Design a protein with these regions (language model features):
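N-terminal intrinsically disordered, cationic/polar leader segments
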Residues: 1-121, 129-152
Length: 152
């Protein structure tokens, strides 16, 4: 059974409507000494990163309220080293923005809770496609990310 939303989160859900999800920036790289086509990938570990960096409420010239949520996602292929930090062989990172129209001005608490618990749900399909595409272009091992809902 799903956990019941807090009052402030439910108010945000009722007030916000997704308008757009887009890529703000990205970076992808294989290290100089790493040839993904000719490497034994069984020794590599895949680590993931996901963070909601920030959110902001804007008022357009037409008086509309917009919530922008900045979400950073990443994956990296590492070679574990005993008693030391792993050696990064390749990585793919992306910053996405999710934009929502806001029916009424929300309290900061509601905006923050929504940003942390719901925005990633809207960004995730774009990240899955982006990561899959970058893996193919870089000839990295395919990473299949599950469909996911973030309910922290």
């Amino acid at each position: 059974m799903a956990a019941k939303n807090s009052v402030s989160l439910q108010k945000a859900i009722d007030s916000l409507s997704i308008q757009d999800v887009y890529l703000k920036s990205s970076q992808a790289e294989c290290c100089e000494d790493f040839d993904p086509k000719r490497t034994d990938h069984t020794e590599l570990l895949v680590q993931q990163m996901h963070t909601v960096r920030r959110s902001e409420v804007l008022k357009t010239n037409e008086g509309e309220l917009i919530l922008k949520v900045y979400v950073r996602l990443g994956a990296r292929w590492v070679l574990p080293i005993e008693n030391d930090d792993p050696e990064v062989k390749a990585f793919v990172e992306a910053d996405f923005i999710a934009e929502y129209s806001m029916a009424e001005l929300l309290e900061t608490e509601a905006v923050e809770e929504f940003s942390l618990k719901n925005a990633s749900f809207h960004v995730w399909p774009y990240w899955r496609e982006f990561l899959s595409s970058q893996c193919e272009r870089l000839r990295l091992p395919r990473v299949v990310l599950p469909t996911v809902q973030f309910n922290c």
